[in-house]
Structure formats: C-alpha cells, structure tokens
Amino acid sequence: MSHIYSVDEIKAIVAPIAAAHDVDGIYLFGSYARGNATEKSDIDLRVDKGRLTDLFALGALYADLEEGLNKKLDLLTTGSLDQKFLQQISKEEITLYEHATT
C-alpha cells in the first residue's frame, strides 16, 4: 500500500534535499496541492533550478527526491514550461522550499 503524504510531510522531506542541491525553489502542484491525492497519485513538483546547470545535477536532484519520498515524481523545471501552463499551475502551487536571500 502506498502512502498518501500530507503537504507538511512532503515539505519536511523536500526542503533539505532542495537546500543540499542549491536550487532556488521547489513548488508542489497537482493532486497533492489540491488535497485530492490518492494512493496511486504521483507527486508533481516544479523546480527553479538555481545553480543546477546540467542534466546530471538535475538527475541527481530527481533521484534524491524520489528516494526520499519513495514515490513516483513529475519534476518540471520552470524554464521548460509553457507560460500558459505555468500560469495554470501557479493557481494551486504550494511552496515547499525557497532559497533564503541575504
């Protein structure tokens, strides 16, 4: 049986991984953000890449997130998204991590 996470549980797992990979932000959208996730739901995340400059670094982030959450992920980068789709998901997004600026 697969676990249905709360947003707080997802944030607790994702935030330290995001910080370790030095991304600018990670945001939850989709069924988990809307509160209607089921056991079969994947976790939809949008990432502002920050210092992730290549596919290997992005792949490492994905692997760490998937291992930490033990769930299938859709990890989308902000730069790869169509503006219309970005506007659509921004209505439901929940911030899981944002890099603190000094």
Q: Which role fits each region the language model picked out?
A:
Residues M1-G25, R34-E39, G50-T102:
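Catalytic core of pol beta-like nucleotidyltransferases
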Residues D42-D44:
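Acidic Asp/Glu-based divalent-cation binding sites
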Residues R46-D48:
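Short hydrophobic/aromatic beta-strand micro-patches
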